[in-house]
Design a protein with these regions (language model features):
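DNA-contacting interfaces and partner/effector-binding or oligomerization modules
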Residues: 2-6, 11-12
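Conserved acetyl-CoA-binding loop-helix of GNAT-fold acetyltransferases
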Residues: 100, 106-119, 145-146
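Acetyl-CoA-dependent GNAT
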Residues: 11-12, 19-92, 96, 101-102, ...
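Short secondary-structure boundary/hinge segments and terminal tails
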Residues: 35, 95, 122, 139, ...
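Conserved short alpha-helix immediately C-terminal to the canonical SAM/SAH-binding motif I
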Residues: 113, 137-140
């Protein structure tokens, strides 16, 4: 296994922000609950196996650089993981996108990207990070929990009237 280096993506390496999305296994759903001012969750596992893949974005470094920061996980000169952070008016930096090339999954690269994102947030006056994951992307949801995020909200309406109807968004926060 080669050493993966996390670095900020700059204009000279801006092509790295368009690494391809790759398929991921959908094996269950996170079900949040809110009682007495506290969030909790249960997990419902799927019967059978299914896969999904988000459409590729066509990010423009030039258009996004003003209010976004890009961190790349690099194996030599090849970007194999990406975290995109968006500046916010409130005290949480938004983890806008997080992805790792499928051949590199299981090597804690997402954890390293989250860790560097959190350091960046703190160094820039934020009190932490926030992000969103679909409830049926259980691997992502559990990864956020395992990386110190907590549930802070749940949107059951966002996908109504779309091909994703029945899915919901879970809001995750990681505090100082």
């Amino acid at each position: 296994m080669s050493e993966i280096i996390i670095r900020e993506i700059t204009e000279s390496t801006s092509d790295d922000i368009n690494i391809k999305n790759e398929r991921f296994k959908k094996f269950g759903k996170m079900i949040p609950s809110y009682q007495n001012g506290k969030w909790d969750y249960t997990v419902s596992e799927n019967e059978g196996e299914s896969w999904d893949c988000f459409p590729d974005e066509n990010y423009s470094f030039e258009k996004m650089a003003k209010d976004h920061v890009f961190l790349g996980a690099c194996d030599g000169s090849v970007c194999v993981g990406l975290a995109i952070l968006r500046h916010q008016w409130h005290k949480y930096l938004y983890l806008y996108d997080l992805k790792v090339n499928s051949a590199y999954r299981g090597q804690h690269i997402a954890t390293d990207l989250i860790s560097e994102s959190f350091k960046y947030a703190l160094a820039n006056g934020y009190r932490g990070l926030w992000t969103i994951a679909q409830d049926n992307n259980l691997a992502a949801c559990l990864s956020y929990i395992n990386n110190g995020f907590r549930i802070g909200g749940f949107d059951t309406e966002v996908y109504n009237g779309t091909s994703l109807e029945g899915s919901a968004d879970i809001y995750f926060y990681k505090d100082v």
